[in-house]
Amino acid sequence: MKYKRPFSLAALAFLITACGNARSEEIGAVDTVFKFIGPDHKIVVDAYDDPKVAGVTCYVSRAKTGGIKGALGLAEDKAEASIACRQTGVISFGGKPLDQQEEMYSERISLVFKKLRVVRMVDAKRNTLVYLTYSDRLIDGSPQNSVTAVPVPAGTVIPVKK
């Protein structure tokens, strides 16, 4: 009985963290290496709708390790990703100001230590949203990254927290 509260708090913390990030939707995948046992190695393309900016979707391609380790979630995926964000509808901000820089999405790409991250930055001078993807580890990250920008129409001002 004494373990219920810590478990409940951990579950609540996980749900709060999960709800803050964008959700991915797999658009497609291509196999790159055939694996006799387990899924093949592949490149996947996922779509992420920006949770705080309606009308912007980011597409991220990345390698996904197959085989038995990949199927069990024990494999470490490569730290290489590419990103392209586009205006997919009318851009709006829901009346809430954005942080100058904010993590939009993160996903575990190894059992414990490595994450793929997508960060949104605001270039207020050029009225543009800049999106960066990179991976990091507990000890050191990878310098490999990819960046894209979405210009916001001139009549729409990006609200930024001061």
Model region roles, listed by residue range:
Residues 1-9:
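Bacterial N-terminal signal peptides that target proteins for export
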Residues 10-11, 22:
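Cleavable N-terminal signal peptides
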Residues 12, 51-52, 78:
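Residue-level signal for mature regions of secreted extracellular proteins and peptides
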Residues 17-18:
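C-terminal motif of bacterial Sec signal peptides marking the signal peptidase cleavage site
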Residues 22-66:
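N-terminal export/targeting and maturation segments
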Residues 43-47, 56-58, 118-120, 128-133:
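Broad, structure-driven detector of short, well-ordered beta-strand segments within folded domains
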Residues 57-122:
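Mature extracytoplasmic domains of secretory-pathway proteins
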Residues 125-162:
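C-terminal partner/receptor-binding element of secreted or periplasmic proteins
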